[in-house]
Amino acid sequence: MCIRDSLARVTAVNLYFNEIQKLIFSLSMWRCTPSFSARARAILEEADKNPDGDVYEMRKRRNYSDFWRSIPLEEPYRVILAEVRDKLYNTREALQEVISGKRHALDPADESVICAKEQLLEPLMACYDSLKEVGDMTVADGFLLDLIRQVHNFGMGLVKLDIRQESDRHADALDAVTKHIGLGSYAEWDEEKRTAFLVGELEGKRPLIANDLECSAEVREVLDTFRMIAHLQKVCPGSLGTYVISMATVASDVLAVVLLQRECGGDPAALLNVAPLFERLDDLRDGPAQLKRLFSVPWYHTHIKGKQEVMIGYSDSGKDAGRLAAAWALYEGQEMATHVGDEFGVKLTLFHGRGGTVGRGGGPSHLAIMSQPPSTINGRLRVTVQGEVIEQNFGEHENCFHTMDLYTAATLEHTLKPPDGPVDEWRDVMATMEKTSCARYREVVFQTPEFNPYFIQATPGQELGSLNIGSRPSKRKSNAGVVALRAIPWIFAWTQSRFHLPVWLGMAEAFQQMKDDGKMGTLRAMYQGWPFFKVTMDLIEMVLAKADPAVAAYYEKELVEPSLHAFGAQLRQALKATTDIVLEITEHPDLLTPQSDTGGQGTYTTLADKLAMRSLYITPLNVVQVENLKLLREIEDGNPRPDWVPTWDWAKEMLGRYESNDLYHAVVSDTLIITMKGIAAGMQNTG
């Protein structure tokens, strides 16, 4: 049992304990059903013959606020709830022993403690049903119902921890298994053969993974993770949420995880729900077909009981194809996936893997939800909240409730009054622009020889990977290049230099093609009448307002070799072209300056004012960052400045254990990190 889960459970127990105390005080009525009265009588009789001593003396020693003496049968709800209070107290004591190392985990067989939320819900529901049956509806629907809802939603651990792993790691594990038992290489099988094998194993009962399996450390890690999942599901039910498969591409990716869960000791009736994460453009397009293939497997269709979670990735799709192409692929993918779910009678919950920045799908919560395709939410929504915006949206009590209000209101509004969908002409326009923008984006990023060295030199992307920033490695694999780079440092690097290239690259060509084809009026109509397109354009406009070509040019001048300067000038020209045509479509006189209702004079929005004020502080940080990037690269090239020696006595004393060059490197790195954090704070959404 992990410390994180134990601490979360202690917090939950304390919350529920206080609520139970209040309910014991308020539920003083005597009217109840005969079965409920019999239950209360049995509890009192058991307490009277308790071999461990006087129950009421024990309650007195625990310093309960009230009702520690014997409760009469005429107060049956208090009798039941007092027993629940005792169990919550016992649970808290047991969890404290787990945290201190005196015991390994809670014992699910111990009836004196509460391990699963069902154990707490059962007596509460018994109270609720009894009150309803005898006509005390006002009491039943008061604090008691509030507590039932809290327990139902938050369980005994408050927050469930999702598990996430790449699909290739599961394939490697199964490859080791099939080779060990003499079936050949799972990695070399086609999708048909993989699916047939997995379904056959899932329908059968034979053990698949041998105890003496010889495998690599990577495979052992995957199998150990599944064994830990099985263990936690037994001793800490409700602690884990969904198993997310990143870089999912085919139906067998999901079946593989279900099989590995079972074969590593998981209870077939309590396996984690498995959510494929479709991230790249081609995977988003093919995702609905793979869901159809998955739901067509009778065993799996029965296993999921009409519910399936699907995660869609905004980050890697944007990095793979550009923001415009990714946005349209996500829109169409959600529509088609929902239709597949309806076809097979499966309620689909879409899990939106959004980042904090527009390049990774970020944006205002309410607008983002309302711009989703009609009939794709239906009262169910999951969304990631990035660490960089957690404090902003949930850091204070008022902000937290305001954010939850926005999510709830938007989800209900979208469900009860879905936004209008696009007409066929608008779909055709988007399909054409998707192809054009994607082709241009990929041409520049993946096919232009100058791009990779320019990116490495003109941004702090390379340095980000070596600094202790972020929760994940900057690259998925050790090989160099943009392809291996994760979406977060990809966006982060361009945001630091104020270029924001991943958001707008390829759009100018797509919009210009429509303009040349006489479709400017159509684009303006789309902006005025289609929530998806309007939100997309407004977010792009916001990012363009945050961009500063002069700052980007300064990074280039100071950090990039002269042979690449012409390429940088082309990119800045593309940024200007994007800005011009976006303003032409939105009919705004300037960025973040909508037309005034009177006289056509622009009025700056609050955001524009904030950006103008922040720029006074961010630009000096950019200058300092450039200087420290130069210094750090000199160190890495083996040419540190030899005359650098600290002159302050306190610095010499505190950092005296370092060699001079190590100290120099530490100071430069720390300064660089400070500039990164400062620019990130000014930009608000960075990675």
Protein language model regions, located:
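Aromatic- and carboxylate-enriched substrate-binding clefts and catalytic-loop regions
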Residues: 155, 304-319, 327, 349-371
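Active-site-proximal beta-alpha loop/turn segments in soluble metabolic enzymes
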Residues: 207-211, 242-243, 277-283, 313-324, ...
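Conserved catalytic alpha/beta cores of large enzymes that bind or transform nucleotide phosphates
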Residues: 9-107, 310-318, 341, 346-348, ...
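C-terminal structured domains
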Residues: 277, 289, 318-327, 333-343, ...
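Conserved small/polar residues in nucleotide/adenosyl-binding loops
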Residues: 1-5
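Acidic, glycine-enriched catalytic cores built around paired aspartates
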Residues: 60-76, 80, 157, 162-164, ...
